[in-house]
Structures are given as structure tokens and as C-alpha cells.
Amino acid sequence: MILSGKEILKRKDQDIIIEPFNENQINPNSYNLRLHNELMVYENSPLDMKEDNAAKKIIIPEDGLLLESRKLYLGRTIEYTETHNLVPMLEGRSSVGRLGLFVHVTAGFGDVGFKGYWTLEIFCVQPIKIYPSVEICQIFYHSVEGEVDPYKSGKYQGNKDIQTSMLYKAVSYTHLRAHETTSH
């Protein structure tokens, strides 16, 4: 079941923490999150899943930044969130999507117990000018049935900045590396 906007407000500072919080950003069943003024872009192409790919920071000026089409930008929300006993999910706002701007490519699903800023995987189908502090996406909450095991991963928990991929740290790739050396 998805929580209503009124229920989000009722659970604020309990199961749901959003800082800073502004009641004007509440929707009927979600809360709008704003775009921070920093982005990151990967410096090399192609990227390698097994490597810590270098990225550089870009600042979005107040008068906007023109994004290139078919290029991945990593951004983050201004708002810090914590979610307890609920599953947080992130989606782009329909007005943003209608401009051909995607705010998450695949990672819109959060875990019970996640604490931090949401890293956005921003991708546009045509050049588009973006601005800092715009309400770019919305967070909504699902209730959980059954016993809850809170999120404990150290990869992204408690982040304070934009997070590039840490897939290279995954255990499965340690196995893959071992397999590569034995198969050659």
C-alpha cells in the first residue's frame, strides 16, 4: 500500500525523516525532492563495472546548465531522507518526464532503513537546460508486510554527496575475477 500525502505528514519525524521539510512539497501520495546544484559526470568511456570509474564535479549555475543528450549525469537531492519501517521509492515528476528528462535510469528503489541523499541518474533524450533547487523528482512510500530487516549496506548508507557506482566492490565480481584468471 502507498502512503497518502497526509500520512507522510503524520509520520514525519517518526518513520519518515526529510530534511529540510516543506509542507508545500507534499502531493496527494508523494513528496517532491529538489535538485542540488552539483552534478558528476564520468571522465572516461567506456566505463568498466569492475573498476572505480573516475568522475568530475560540475556546478549548476543559478542561470542554468545545458545538459547534453545521451549523456549520464549523476546528481543528488537537496533533501536528506531516512525511512524506517517503510520502503521508499523515487520517481521523476511527470512535468520533468514530459521534457524528456529521466531522473533515474534503474535505481528508484530504496531499502527500509536507508539514510542519506538520493543519487539521481539524470539522462536526457535531447539537450535541456536545468536549474538548481527545481523540484525534479518525488519520493513515495510503501508499507511493508512481515518482519523487517533494515538496510545495513555500507556502500551508500549515510552518504553526504553524490555517489558514483560502487559495483566494483561487490562480492560477485571478486568471484568473476577469480574465474577470469582460471579460464585463460
For each of these PLM feature ranges, what is it?
Residues 20-23, 64, 108-110, 127:
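A generic local secondary-structure boundary/capping motif
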Residues 32, 40, 69-132, 137-150:
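Glycine-rich active-site loops that engage anionic ligands at enzyme catalytic sites
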Residues 50-70:
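A short mixed-secondary-structure module that forms the rim of ligand-binding clefts
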